[in-house]
A protein has these predicted regions:
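Conserved lysine of the Walker
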Residues: 18
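Hydrophobic positions on the alpha1 helix immediately C-terminal to the Walker A/P-loop
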Residues: 21
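ATP-dependent small-molecule kinase phosphotransfer cores
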Residues: 42-102, 109
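Hydrophobic anchor at the beta1->P-loop junction of P-loop NTPases
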Residues: 10
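NTP-dependent small-molecule kinase module
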Residues: 168-208
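Short beta-strand-centered segment that lines the nucleotide-binding/catalytic pocket of NTP-utilizing
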Residues: 29-47
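P-loop (Walker A) phosphate-binding loop of NTP-binding proteins
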Residues: 13
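A glycine- and Lys/Arg-enriched "phosphate-lid" helix/loop adjacent to the NTP-binding pocket
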Residues: 122-169
């Protein structure tokens, strides 16, 4: 048993539709929804250099240093949220939420190795992994405020780097999930969001 058995976990790579799908589920079933992306700012303020050395280095980088000047392998290795920094704060937040109803948590910060100890039933967690084409299309349709690569001196190179970095991250998620007995669901755009949301609802045992 886990003290977080009332939580349903949706992790995965960027551009897979995690936010869209979990909002559909939250609206459909009246669930509390926790976005790990939305808490990055607040959690960053609580993390120091000792707790989060990768984050400390990331803070000091310019936009070009983050997204243009380094190769994707280095970008993956140096991105704090891909390596569990601040994950303990997510767990702290979840434990402060009501336990008498289901909570849906979503975001790329949910790493299989870190989530697994908090999951009694593997069906309560899933990782959404976009295909390369779906990821690229998702990034290119992001609103201007979210297109951080546009704030570099070479947006085209920055986007290429980010897409390759995220491919590496997605591959690691698939590998780690399989090793931990957890499921990764590939998203290729061939199904509607409603169809995928229905599959997730069945998986999570959600009922109106």
């Amino acid at each position: 048993m886990s003290d977080l058995d009332h939580v349903r976990w949706v992790g995965g790579g960027s551009g897979a539709g995690k936010t869209t799908l979990t909002r559909l589920l939250a609206d459909r079933f009246g669930l509390d929804l926790y976005s790990t992306d939305a808490m990055i700012g607040a959690h960053s303020e609580r993390l120091g250099a000792t707790d989060a050395p990768l984050l400390e280095r990331f803070r000091r980088m310019s936009m070009d240093e983050r997204w243009v000047e380094h190769d994707p392998v280095t970008m993956y290795a140096s991105f704090p949220w891909f390596h569990g920094e601040g994950f303990n704060l997510l767990i702290e937040d979840l434990r402060q939420m009501p336990t008498d109803r289901l909570v849906l948590i979503e975001g790329f910060r949910l790493l299989p190795d870190l989530v697994r100890p908090h999951v009694s039933n593997p069906s309560n967690a899933v990782w959404l992994v976009p295909t390369a084409d779906f990821r690229r299309a998702a990034f290119k349709t992001r609103r201007e405020a979210d297109a951080f690569w546009m704030r570099t001196t070479d947006p085209a190179q920055a986007l290429r780097n980010v897409l390759e970095r995220d491919r590496l991250f997605s591959n690691k998620i698939v590998s780690d999930a399989a090793r931990r007995g957890l499921e990764a669901l590939h998203i290729d755009g061939q199904r509607t969001a409603d169809s995928v949301a229905t599959e997730l609802a069945l998986r999570f045992g959600l009922h109106r």
